[in-house]
Regions:
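Generic start-of-chain signal for non-secretory N-termini
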Residues: 1-20, 27
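A short acidic Gly-Thr/Ser loop motif
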Residues: 29, 313-317, 519
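Active-site proximal loops enriched in glycine and acidic residues that flank catalytic Cys/His/Asp
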Residues: 313, 325, 334, 368-370, ...
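Feature marking long nucleic-acid-engaging regions of large polymerase/nuclease enzymes
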Residues: 31-45
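Duplex nucleic acid-engaging cores and interfaces of nucleic-acid transaction enzymes
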Residues: 34, 50-53, 60-310, 314-414, ...
Length: 535
């Protein structure tokens, strides 16, 4: 445990005492919102961002420890686990360092080096590496085989691999060129600006790299990773491998083998590592932006206590209109055709005016999709009773909600167009309560959201929703099961039980009444009670 605490503390730059407390609480089943709000005395007042960082780092560290145990076992089984190697494996702080140490003992496919070993050329390779041979008295095939073996040894040397990694990090470039036979298409594609693109890896912006990767995946571009002074790097690699006082014949063969190792084995491998690291870094930046965008949408100020006229605009199929009350309940629905092709502005104005008067509606929520601007101009000139203020509302994901099981359960007798318009109106009344019903990825939170690691994106967005819900808290007597499911310690099953109990027994009079809900144990109650409001 101490080893894990120290590793997490190093990764997060947080005090070991606080990190240890957070890990203990997480292992006891506590959630990030609960720890950051109600266990400050144990964590040294770490905030939610810090606690979340510990949770994320802990997962990575435990994965590394699991891999470390596997590597130790595999190397021991191979009979190669010396005390020195064991110490180096136990000290490896990153997965890259660990895999470098494991590389010589990892099961391999058939390679040039393995073929050379089968032919008995390894003793010659060892003599060349010793550097004492004044002349190489062996056949050309034997020398080539020995050099293949030496090249493999060089490629499995952590020091050489790290030299190449540092060179890519310091002097590496990513270059883009048009894919074969796609030059003309590239000129009219969204990626035209990236033709001939060349940028230092350390200066390549996350959105640029994601765009390059997308263009490569779609067949428009070919990407290449280069190092500015490759000959100097190869010379440094040769100088770092083999005995310093090797004879000239041995030195020439060792240098040739190292050069071959760099071009054939090390560089392609490190290129892949570099591309993966760049992608991971770009994903991290993009996912952070997407999470921030989602947080802003979820925490937009609610317009509670207002009765809303909501419109989902459209051209040919008309503008779907609903009236919803202060709680978001559907009062009435209609369809109007105020814009092209019908332009029935008079009929549309009469229908809206009637709905406003009959249901005492005082604000308008207008979806920002197709025909939104044209419909907004119509509303401005319609002369509606009371001149209600018009709010333009994002309708991203409304169509997803309208076809969901949740929407069908709420409005089994209404079609998807009515359900979508209701969602737009509810987003104005209480954005958080409505948007949690939709998969966060369907809300449309960023330009490259489909290019990043989808598992990481889903995890980050789900956490953002949970964080927002718990930062605001919910009214246990009005919250939907979907909203309750994000509360600390509850989850989908218990949320359904709460709603069912509330439906059968009436509103909760106090938090303690929650203990009567089936499956609401002491731990769940402890973790959730502070985030639930009972008016």
């Amino acid at each position: 445990m101490t080893r894990i605490v120290k590793a997490v503390a190093r990764r997060t730059s947080l005090p070991e005492a606080g990190v240890g407390a957070v890990i203990s609480l997480l292992d006891e089943g506590a959630t990030v919102p609960f720890i950051s709000r109600y266990r400050k005395e144990r964590t040294g007042s770490l905030d939610e961002v810090a606690v979340r960082a510990v949770e994320t780092a802990l997962e990575a560290v435990r994965e590394l420890e699991k891999r470390r145990e596997f590597v130790l076992g595999a190397v021991a089984e191979a009979g190669a686990l010396t005390p020195e190697l064991k110490a180096r494996i136990e000290e490896a702080d990153t997965s890259t360092d660990l895999e470098d140490l494991y590389a010589p003992y990892k099961p391999k496919r058939r390679t040039r080096a393995s073929i050379a070993r089968e032919k008995g050329f390894e003793p010659l390779a060892k003599r060349i590496m010793a550097g004492r041979m004044a002349r190489i008295d062996a056949s050309e095939e034997a020398v080539e085989g020995a050099c293949d073996i030496i090249a493999e040894w060089a490629s499995e040397t952590p020091r050489l691999r790290n030299m190449v990694r540092r060179a890519f990090s310091r002097d590496g470039f990513v270059e883009a060129s048009a894919a074969k036979d796609r030059e003309k298409e590239l000129e009219t594609s969204p990626y035209a600006e990236y033709a001939g693109f060349s940028r230092e890896l350390r200066r390549c912006r996350s959105h640029q790299y994601l765009a390059l990767r997308r263009a490569e995946a779609e067949g428009f571009l070919k990407l290449k990773y280069t190092i500015s002074d490759e000959p100097r790097l190869v010379g440094s690699l040769c100088g770092a491998f083999g005995p310093k006082d090797a004879s000239r014949p041995c030195r020439e063969l060792i240098d040739a083998a190292v050069t071959d190792a760099y071009k054939r084995l090390i560089k392609p491998s490190v290129e892949n590592e570099t591309a993966s690291a760049l992608k991971e870094e770009a994903d991290t930046v993009a996912i952070g932006i997407f999470s921030d965008n989602l947080r802003q949408l979820l925490l937009a100020p609610p317009l509670r206590g207002r009765r809303v006229l909501a419109l989902d605009p459209g051209f040919r199929t008309g503008c779907k209109v609903v009236a919803v009350d202060e709680q978001g309940a559907l009062l009435a629905d209609a369809v109007i055709y105020p814009v092209e092709p019908r332009r029935d502005t008079g009929g549309g104005a009469r229908i809206l005016s009637d709905l406003i008067r009959r249901h005492r509606l005082d604000v308008v929520a207008l979806g920002n999709g197709t025909a939104s601007r044209e419909t907004e101009r119509f509303l401005a000139s319609a002369g509606l009773p009371g001149n209600p203020q018009v709010y333009v509302v994002s309708e991203s994901g409304a169509s997803v909600y309208s076809a969901s099981d949740i929407a069908r359960a709420e409005f089994p007798d209404k079609d998807v167009t009515v359900r979508g318009a209701v969602s737009i109106g509810r987003r104005l009344i209480d954005p958080l309560a409505e948007l949690v019903k939709i998969d966060p990825k369907s809300i449309g939170v960023g330009q490259y959201q489909h290019d990043v690691d989808q598992s990481r994106l889903q995890q980050a967005l789900d956490y953002t929703v949970m964080s927002c819900v718990n930062s605001v808290g919910v009214d246990v007597n009005t919250a939907s099961a979907k909203l309750l499911g994000y509360i600390s310690g509850i989850g989908p099953l218990l949320a359904s039980n709460i709603v069912k109990y509330r439906t059968e027994n009436g509103p909760f009079a106090s938090r303690s009444d929650l203990r009567r809900v089936p499956r609401m144990g002491d731990k769940a109650y402890e973790l959730s009670a502070g985030f639930l409001r009972v008016p």
